Amino acid sequence: MDLHPVALDTPVTTYDPSRPTPAAIVSGHIAAHDAPHPLSVFDMFRIGIGPSSSHTVGPMRAGLAFTTELAPLPPPSHITIDLFGSLGATGRGHSTDRAVLLGLAGYDPETVDIETVESILPSLASSSMLTLPSGTQVPLSIAEDVRFVPRTVLPYHVNALTITASDKDGTVILERTYYSVGGGFVMIQTNDDPHNPEVSSLATSQAGVGIDVPAPHPFASGAQLLAACDASGLSIAELVRHNEEAVRPRETVNAYLDRIADTMFDCVDAGTSATGILPGGLDVPRRARALAGKLARRLLGPSTPTTAETGQGVPDDARAWVSTATDPMRAMDWVNLFALAVNEENAAGHRVVTAPTNGAAGVIPAVLGYLVTHCPETGSTPGIAAGPDTRDGSIAPLSHIRLTGRPVDSTPEGSELADGAAAHEHRRTLVHEFLLAATAIGALIKTNASIAGAEVGCQGEVGSASAMAAAGLAQALGGSPQQVENAAEIAMEHSLGLTCDPVAGLVQVPCIERNAIAAVKAINAARMALWGDGRHTVSLDVVIETMR
């Protein structure tokens, strides 16, 4: 394995103050109506590691940017990291220190392997040496050189960090201040005035490509989005696709949508196969695997024995509240499972999709999982014993629904998923429509309010994810633009006031369960909207403004 996969000339740290970028739009540095192109699906959904997009992914990108800029300069003898404000307050619980160090070592949150993530702090603790991508080893004490400064809040943003590299005489070689503004987006300070900072945004290898290319259907509000759909005759998903394909070839867009969906499905399956206690000191046990096993066996009760021949439960302690194989509410159990699995993976610091944040990473995969396993529009067969196909004995509930890397005929004989290339392609199309419609809603929230829990509370994280998921599901089930907007509005409206209140600063309690609740809320919001005609009293724009 290449320990430092990021080449020193990778242009991940280039920035141009005159060029609009997603980070500049998200941070409010550039007004949404001044941006020629709405935020892209490449901006809204990004692969990274847990547990926080603003406190883990963003700082890791900052560390990578710093080490890349440092590469052509004289080798440093000392590096210090100062974590200010919210990063200082919850940085230990959110693994901010580990994230910055991973970035400085040359790792990207999208590609770093989990073994490296888990080994870097023990390695530093034993050696007190940080190896830069160039191979230079720099003495670094985690206790002394990574400083948490929660009571100092820098003027530009509550999530700030400063990295300083100096020579053996203490002369500064390079010093940079970064601001993690939410969703993994990062701004860099370009002047030395601490009271009046000037900032620009970091570019990345994917996000921001074409943000300054005029979109064929620009929109900066929900009203403008609906007007653009009316004028063009396009659905919200089709309109977003047209904007995407003005910048990138269709094949590139589709490949990215496939990758995002498959990473979500893989995360669900990883969470359902993992056991143990989540890190951080709260001793929170993983629950997804046990729940997956019960649902896969079609249990009729919480502790029901099964027969080897049929896998069906024989109830010995059945209770009225226990969902059975004939209970239509059983679908909710699967949705809960999907969300719990993803957020347990996130809490463990493993691979997730930022959607739109890591703290809310379980909502959209849970609703997407519901779409592909319980909705007949995607070829699933709801009804008695409805749920993912687990007749091969696996408790990885989405292992047969990946969009890529799975031959169509690889599903078990008799499975409702063994339905040929045409059905597979239809399912893929609906998944793409889901993600594209969710992108539109997420872009509106990001540009007109905030998705950072440190700024607006959990209403901006889980609330936004619920709105995006509701819109995506309504779109995939055939909703009109007005119904899709209504679904997002319902989910967002009934998330207003939700605070960011993690116990001990960990993205575990109440965050993991909260994702499950928000996923079910999103499904209900979509169904309510689809039973209506799209007309409603409070607009999505008003709800977003209220949240801000």
Please name every model-derived segment:
Residues 251-379, 420-453, 457:
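Accessory "access/gating" subregions that flank catalytic or transport cores
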Residues 45-65, 349-367, 458-467:
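Conserved phosphate/anionic-ligand binding catalytic regions in large, soluble enzymes, centered on
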Residues 54-69, 365-377, 424, 471-478:
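Alpha-helical support elements that line or immediately flank enzyme active sites
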